[in-house]
């Protein structure tokens, strides 16, 4: 057992202490002060260990934080983690971190404050073996839960030239890691029509609701389960009163797909549907609100084998799992970079008031993460 793995074996209590601090700090995606406060805890933990953190200011959202262990000339390894959660400000004071000794509970405990802890302790452990044959970077972002609008370009920039990306989103309930994810796009459709009294001069109106309803039927027809494509309009609103022909209507569309190459054709079909004027006197506008690219597993088969081997050496087994959920790992995987996700501690019921994390997975998952990085180092030297 090398020094880094052995050191991690003694870090259960410090890891839980940091986890408690993070969970007890509100960090909704739109709460910049809260997301930055979580960042302050991470900065303190790393700087106490002698690791500097670079901050890139972001207006309106959490700043971007980058820490790096210097290394040799081999391509770097990048770790990812997001500091924001879906829970509104005030959740942590109302129901903060608790534990029954086996499980930890609290807002974002699994998604993904447990993963942030792993990233910190992985870097601190690897520092004990420095210098490595390559730099190891950790990027902490602040708006993943709402689409990574401020983070995507930075993620892709920092990932340029890296040999692998390891994202510590929560491990699956099964204990598995994530080897493939769907891509997802959220779109806003805004339809305008012409108001009229529904009894006095109905024919003078142009119903935005009718036009939108016709589009929804066509949009839902884009679903193709055999190809892994789904279309879902989950929100609709419109009109001013029941006796007025609706002058406006809006809908939010969620699209999921499994291959990067699918998106261009899907988008073209959506644009054609939105632009079609089914009801004379109406028009529609389409806006992309959030875009996550899919994480295709074919890029990461070797990386998954390395992680599985490290897990077995530590006494637990994992497989790669596919999920329909999206994550920042899709951005790097779509660039062809070997990427694994779901490497964080095992947890479940995320985004609910019953979210939990299995405390006894903190150390072994951190060890497997570090072991994977060290195995990449050995492979590069062979």
Where in the sequence are the language-model features?
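Acidic/histidine-rich catalytic neighborhood of metal-dependent amide-processing enzymes
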Residues: 112-182, 381-382
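Glycine/serine-rich anion-binding loops at beta->alpha junctions
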Residues: 87, 102-118, 197
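Metal-dependent amide/peptide-bond hydrolase catalytic core
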Residues: 1-3, 27, 50, 54-57, ...
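A structural signal for isolated positions on well-ordered beta-strands in alpha/beta enzyme cores
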Residues: 78, 135-139, 285
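Acidic/His- and Gly-rich active-site-bordering loop/insert found
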Residues: 2-107, 128, 132
């Amino acid at each position: 057992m090398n020094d880094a793995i052995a050191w991690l074996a003694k870090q259960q209590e410090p890891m839980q202490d940091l986890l408690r601090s993070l969970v007890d700090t509100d960090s909704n995606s739109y709460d910049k002060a809260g997301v930055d406060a979580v960042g302050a805890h991470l900065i303190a933990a790393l700087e106490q260990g002698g690791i500097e953190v670079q901050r890139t200011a972001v207006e309106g959202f959490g700043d971007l934080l980058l820490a790096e262990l210097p290394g040799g000339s081999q391509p770097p390894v990048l770790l990812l983690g997001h500091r924001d959660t879906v829970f509104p400000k005030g959740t942590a004071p109302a129901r903060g971190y608790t534990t029954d000794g086996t499980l930890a509970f609290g807002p974002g405990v699994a998604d993904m404050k447990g993963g942030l802890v792993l990233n910190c302790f992985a870097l601190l452990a690897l520092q004990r073996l420095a210098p490595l044959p390559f730099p190891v970077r950790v990027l902490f972002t602040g708006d993943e839960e709402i689409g990574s609008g401020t983070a995507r370009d930075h993620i892709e920039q920092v990932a340029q030239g890296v040999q692998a990306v390891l994202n510590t989103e929560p491990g699956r309930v099964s204990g598995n890691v994530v080897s493939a994810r769907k891509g997802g796009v959220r779109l806003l459709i805004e339809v305008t029509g012409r108001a009229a009294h529904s009894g006095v001069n109905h024919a003078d109106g142009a119903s935005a609701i009718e036009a939108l309803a016709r589009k929804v039927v066509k949009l839902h027809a884009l679903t193709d389960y055999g190809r892994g494509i789904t279309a879902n309009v989950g929100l609709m609103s419109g009109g001013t009163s029941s006796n007025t022909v609706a002058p406006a209507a809006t809908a939010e569309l969620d699209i999921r797909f499994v291959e990067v190459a699918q998106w261009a054709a899907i988008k073209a079909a959506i644009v054609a549907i939105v632009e079609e004027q089914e009801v004379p006197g109406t028009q529609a506008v389409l806006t992309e609100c959030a875009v996550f690219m899919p994480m295709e597993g074919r890029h990461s088969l070797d990386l998954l084998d390395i992680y599985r081997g490290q897990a077995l050496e530590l006494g637990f087994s994992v497989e790669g799992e596919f999920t329909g959920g999206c994550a920042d790992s899709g951005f790097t995987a779509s660039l062809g970079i070997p990427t694994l996700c779901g490497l964080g501690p095992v947890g479940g019921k995320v985004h609910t008031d019953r979210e939990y994390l299995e405390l006894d997975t903190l150390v072994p998952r951190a060890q497997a993460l570090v072991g994977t990085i060290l195995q990449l180092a050995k492979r590069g030297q062979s």
